[in-house]
Amino acid sequence: MTQSTFGIEEEYFLTDLTSRQVARRNVEAFATACQYELGERVTREMFAAQFEVVTPVLHSLTDARQCLEGARRALARLAREFDCGVLAAGTHPLGQWRRVRATDMPRYRAIFDDYRMVASRSVLAGLHVHVGVAEGVDRIRLMNRLTPWLPLLLGLSASSPFWNGRPSGLMSYRQAVCDEWPRMGIPDHFADEAEYQRYVQVMTDTGCIRSAANLWWNIRPSLRYPTLELRIADACPRLDDALCLAGLFRAMVEHVQLTPHHAWCDDPLTRVLTLENRWRAKRQGLRGLFIEPASQRLLTFATWLEEVLERIAIQVPASDRWILEHARNLALHGGSAEAQLAEYRGARANGLEHGEALHQVVDSLMAQTELHPSQQLA
């Protein structure tokens, strides 16, 4: 099988360097500068100070690294011209949703009109990965097989332990906010793409949704491209984490295209167990115990991850084998959410006030996002 093409979308918060809050000043000027220098590679999101980088179709993680490194550095340089920085994380540690301005575009006005406070509270940033699916392959049947693994990808990416300027008690509070929306979270089960299309037809014919683009599940078939789109992952401050997740999801998609379908994937119990595992990943990140959905054994995150890595490793090209060890290291040493909380607690233990400690966390996240050398993993 030819290696699948893929694409990555990363979301960032423009951050005021004085207040460390989500920026309110110079946002439109920054957007204009981005448009001039980066063109269609950067798009506006629901909130004025939120931006997304969209890669072209990619063939390797090397290409992805080059593309995203260039984009992150360009955004950081442009942001400094307006006394701002850029920050990638599932939530902004100092983000106050009541203070964040919406983007004044027809598409987003319609969303805010439909979903009201649910939309207004969703000051969130995600990592989305599209992976191409071979022609003639039923994407829904693939989605059914991939869905039980989604909690692993959430745990690896979790980077949103803070909400509204305080620790939330969750490793991915972003997913907690997502649960306020309809048609988010773990997708409903459909037997195949034909059944899924019937559902979309009913929902659009009755005016419940404008199009399949209003199905925001943690994984979904793309409306515009012949891809499956991963949506569960929090935005990653460290580029290596984002690339690792993209490579793992690509390998997972290739694996399920090449191996036989298993009946347990269609068992209603599997979806219920996946919901439980998603909660555990949202709450505990890489810690705690998870229910392996096929055998229903209770496993540590690291043990479950290792079992999945052993299955998909053959799909990872030699140049990308580093992602396997990187994922293991995250499971062993912790990801972004744990690092943010450790930095916050350390700052408080050293005598900093609550707000000052959060400033320190924001500074670290900006340094990681902007690829400052001292913040990159060896």
Curated annotation (Swiss-Prot):
InterPro entries: GCL_type2/YbdK_subfam, GCS2, Gln_synth/guanido_kin_cat_dom, YbdK. One of its GO terms (molecular function) is glutamate-cysteine ligase activity. It comes from the Bacteria. Keywords: ATP-binding, Ligase, Nucleotide-binding. Transmembrane segments: none annotated. One of its GO terms (biological process) is modified amino acid biosynthetic process. It catalyses: L-cysteine + L-glutamate + ATP = gamma-L-glutamyl-L-cysteine + ADP + phosphate + H(+). It is an enzyme of class 6 (ligase). Its EC number is 6.3.2.2. The keyword Ligase applies. ATP-dependent carboxylate-amine ligase which exhibits weak glutamate--cysteine ligase activity. Belongs to the glutamate--cysteine ligase type 2 family. YbdK subfamily. This is Putative glutamate--cysteine ligase 2. It comes from Ectopseudomonas mendocina (strain ymp) (Pseudomonas mendocina). The lineage of its organism: Bacteria, Pseudomonadati, Pseudomonadota, Gammaproteobacteria, Pseudomonadales.
